[in-house]
Amino acid sequence: MVYHWRGDLGSWRLLLLLLLLAAWKVGSGQLHYSVPEEAKHGTFVGRIAQDLGLELAELVPRLFRVASKRHRDLLEVNLQNGILFVNSRIDREELCGRSAECSIHLEVIVDRPLQVFHVDVEVKDVNDNPPVFRVKEQKLFVSESRMPDSRFPLEGASDADVGANSVLTYRLSFHDYFMLDVNSKNDENKLVELVLRKSLDREDAPAHDLFLTATDGGKPELTGTVQLLVTVLDVNDNAPNFEQSEYEVRIFENADNGTTVIKLNASDRDEGANGAISYSFNSLVETMVIDHFSIDRNTGEIVIRGNLDFEQENFYKIRIDATDKGHPPMAGHCTVLVRILDKNDNVPEIALTSLSLPVREDAQFGTVIALISVNDLDSGANGQVTCSLMPHVPFKLVSTFKNYYSLVLDSALDRESVSAYELVVTARDGGSPSLWATASLSVEVADVNDNAPAFAQPEYTVFVKENNPPGCHIFTVSARDADAQENALVSYSLVERRVGERSLSSYVSVHTESGKVYALQPLDHEELELLQFQVSARDAGVPPLGSNVTLQVFVLDENDNAPALLEPRVGGTGGSASELVPRSVGAGHVVAKVRAVDADSGYNAWLSYELQPAASSPRIPFRVGLYTGEISTTRVLDEADSPRHRLLVLVKDHGEPALTATATVLVSLVESGQAPKASSRQSAGVVGPEAALVDVNVYLIIAICAVSSLLVLTLLLYTALRCSALPTEGGCRAGKPTLVCSSAVGSWSYSQQQSQRVCSGEGPPKTDLMAFSPCLPPDLGSVDVGEERDLNVDHGLKPRQPNPDWRYSASLRAGMHSSVHLEEAGILRAGPGGPDQQWPTVSSATPEPEAGEVSPPVGAGVNSNSWTFKYGPGNPKQSGPGELPDKFIIPGSPAIISIRQEPANSQIDKSDFITFGKKEETKKKKKKKKGNKTQEKKEKGNSTTDNSDQ
């Protein structure tokens, strides 16, 4: 049925007022819910959104939330359906205790507009707690003389629940002698009493067991039970009696446990159990009596159970009770006085006071270290104590008063030898037998800065590869100071000096605390081979002490320089040279020679040459020498060969990784008649300087031969004169010249310069003479020539041991087994003005054999036409013109030859040169001496060609 509302304007106003009133009640009213305690998670409480008149869709937009100051985690609202549910366990007893009412107040807040709703959720009690008695059993003692209807109060039970769940009812198990009476003043205060029905007879039933049960009013009911133990007591009317009220006993201290002190006896006129007596200490007796004595309950015998010490307690007063076994029991009393007699049972006591520790190792004699006092609790001779100190220590005891001593310093201290002393002081009394005690005293010796930091060795050798990153760690120095604490705290610093034009601190730095040495900038082997400096170690004592250590840093070479092509034959990388070759030349004809140098040393400067294949002309009738760089024909040229060839020669060193350079050689094949003209035009501006160089080399060879011959004659004459002359006092004798020979692969000849020095008879002078002979076997390192013998060497003599001045590097030893011929080995180092002759690189000229001996092997990049010499790490400068190096390599020989240089102010003989010839050239020169002029011209031409390559 549908009703239609029709009314006037007043009715509409009344309806609107009612709606506003209802909305106000909803907005400011209060909701009430109830939930049982111990409800599970998710238990439904109420549709709070619906009850508040809120739509589910507006709960989230209006920020519907529950705010509660306490217990906000117990209840939660599901914003999807607006249901209030249990979020966690609710324990009413924990929440409200035993309060009759228990509720959780919630504040529900929504925004837009802001509204606050109050919700009370009542927590209903659940009968989840049974009645509980405080004890599991209650004991009652009832005399057999008690009358019927006697009442004995019992302790009731308690229930943590409230309301009907906590209302308790009691019932007693059926019994003939007892019944239960409950007086209920209210539900919370009930008096439970046990009522005696009839008189008890102990002889019939000495004890009774009953069970009291409490039941609450919950659904279902919960119960609790307690056991009642009723003991019937006998009647007793006579107390035990001792013979005397006080006893006195004397006993020595330290008597053995179990020793009888006294045996007591008491009597009781009662009969049976009421006349049986037991002995015990009175309840008021002191604890120390119980600790030292015990009494037998049946016999009354008192014995010792603890050690008796006269010094602690010399008198004990013991109260004894004799109790019969009647009901109720009756007791008699007496007192036992125990006096303790003294014995020598205490060892002396040692006390150390006023310690003055630690003791400085420079303390004066007589310095007081500590005050020592001794004491003995015994009396008489047992308490007289003498004190002594252990022997062989730098201390002694001085008596200052009775039983007081001073420990003083008796001799000098040295902390570095002994840093601490464990002293033993002995105190002995005068008892018989005598007792003694010891005390230990640790005397620490304070350090004084009397030791400087010391390094493990005075000098260290460090090897660092060049091109190191700035700030890299290269070495760590460590100095040890025998002192302690601040005196042993070592700090490190550089001993500043100049390294060339720069300061040492621009190259390296040292960490003050750790001693780590860092390279501040990349080191260059070509610029600096050896960096020698000192590091200072200084302690923090007052005054500070220090020492220095020397570091020799050898910079090892890395392959950081690519081969450089030399002018004028071949330009730099990308350059080219043109050569005209007649077609009539045969196989093996040298067309051109590519020359290159490498600024590195060792294997990094050992160059090899390769001919790059051309894609346009796969059949190239040319090849390049692997180590000489000479481009020669591989066969006879014919008309089928292309008239122009573009040859790409790859120059590569043997470093890791290898660096390369490329030279371009343009070879034009011409007819035989055109070659001389073109060649003359081409070499007009190029061969001229080389021809001049060839002429100079020829003159040098002639000059060296002449000077060498003259020098040999002079030496022979000088030796003959020295042998015939009588020795004069204070004169100088000629030193033993050392004859050093090269191997059979190559030979050197140079002038021999004899140097005489004025001496005063201290010993034979040393000579600067070293001669090289090409005819000795290669394994003969050196031959000692006698002072009165001629310098001519008998080649038939037995080879002697090598001269220790010769040193073989690892690379040279490997090169001794190489099959590479010297004729194919060549390196030409360019000087500032073009190609110039330099000395061979000898990395092994360093003071230490481990200083990076990386010299190439025989034939490995060391060209007889190009020699490069570098001084050892101790002297990085290059040799000037006319100066002889200290050490160099003999081509074809693994030996490193040492030549003494004249002082800087001496005049160098311009006639002293070293000629680097080849094996074939030596043979040709011998033929030249025989008068073969044709062969002489040919040899000159070959020599000119070889020298021009230099």
Curated annotation (Swiss-Prot):
Residues in compartment: Extracellular = 30-697
Query: Annotated Gene Ontology MF terms?
Result: calcium ion binding
Q: Which residues form the Cadherin domain?
A: 30-133, 157-242, 243-350, 351-455, 456-565, 581-678
Q: Where is this region: Disordered?
A: 831-950
TM ranges are: 698-718
Q: Where are the PXXP repeats?
A: 774-777, 799-802, 832-835, 873-876, 891-894
- Region described as 5 X 4 AA repeats of P-X-X-P: 774-894
The record's Gene Ontology cellular component field reads: plasma membrane
Point to the regions of Basic and acidic residues compositional bias: 909-923
Taxonomic superkingdom: Eukaryota
The identity of this protein, by name, is Protocadherin alpha-8
- The gene for this chain is PCDHA8
